[in-house]
């Protein structure tokens, strides 16, 4: 390989090819903006220092999405360890720094209070926040999100049991643009339920205040259009609060809400004129049959 007389081309074999190292920063940013975040991590950032620095540009770091990465791997109990959380925290803080406060979307799992508070204090334009499976995120950092990120329009706090109904009040009061809320819980253990990868002691902290959360949602989050509350413990009374308060709902996911009947759902949602899709609980779950051997029957003993 030889460089051809200062013409910005590299001679390889029998042909001449552009010398990509000569591209201006503006050209690099234009090219890299067409790649996903993960594509930049495994490609351009490894080519040269110049390309890596371009990938650090704030305009390329307004969205931090690890959700697709998590989905590409099977669930692991190791994700629930402090060591793994430290790695996720470090990653989030580095992206916050690169964005220079310009982050608008965060989709992450297994972060902690430390990195989320760091993001809340530096990213006032945050609009989308997914923090699923974050046992060490509590009301303290969610209060910072509510106070510092008033433009929040989409929030996913599924399976994060350290976040209580108190956060829903604070977020509802401060984030008037909130349109999407996902507060899904993990299925409780049972023979017909999917396998759950999580520490048993964490599963025991399952939130049991479904009606309280439902009343708060109906009172403070009246602009919601999309609501997911899978496996909530709410009853017909709680669903009534949600439907009366959130009259603009277009989508509801009530899977696993075993305290609701078909009649409860039909009655309470009948007034939601904009509702286009509702996912209901399974009203006919499979029943585990226990076979008890009869004394004296050799085929069953």
UniProtKB/Swiss-Prot annotation:
Keywords: Leucine-rich repeat, Repeat. SUPFAM superfamilies: F-box domain (SSF81383), RNI-like (SSF52047). It holds the Pfam family F-box. Residues 18-66 form the F-box domain. Disulfide bonds: none annotated. This is Putative F-box/LRR-repeat protein 19. InterPro entries: F-box-like_dom_sf (IPR036047), F-box_dom (IPR001810), Leu-rich_rpt_Cys-con_subtyp (IPR006553), LRR_dom_sf (IPR032675). It comes from Arabidopsis thaliana. LRR repeats lie at residues 108-133, 134-159, 160-185, 231-256, 257-282. The gene is FBL19.
